[in-house]
Amino acid sequence: DYPKMFGLKPEFEIMTTADLLDSLLREEKLRFSRPLNLHVTYHDPCHSGRHVSIYLPELEKEKVFEPPRNVLKALPGVKLTEMPRNRELSWCCGAGGGAKSAYPDWAIWTATERLKEAQETGAQAIVSTCPFCRRNLSDAVEASKTPLQVYDLTELVAQAL
């Protein structure tokens, strides 16, 4: 947005945390030492999935959706199982765009539906890269007493170091 809004082109590359971690893994600058022994599923956030694809259509889908999956697959002792609705077809968690503030009951219902999909994979945990998703999915776990853990990708990376 900066080049369009201000006529400025930054002298640095802007990337997501998942992109950075994926890049560090490919460059062999990041290594893990602790196995996590955890079965997970990944929730694609609207902000880093559909929205990025809409605003930056020149990006290939694999560059948007694969970095967090590559990181999860590299974590020792982590098994990743996809939910049926994933990548650009992912079900929204209900938190984005101010929905959680404006419609809190709907937001929890939506997140609970997503948790049902996660449970159907047999996963012990649902992982995302969006703080809004993490918060709303955690709130839905508490409200519905769903036996799932909710993590941000960086939390698992830190545990495996």
Model segments located where?
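Iron-sulfur cluster-binding electron-transfer modules in prokaryotic oxidoreductases
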Residues: 1-161
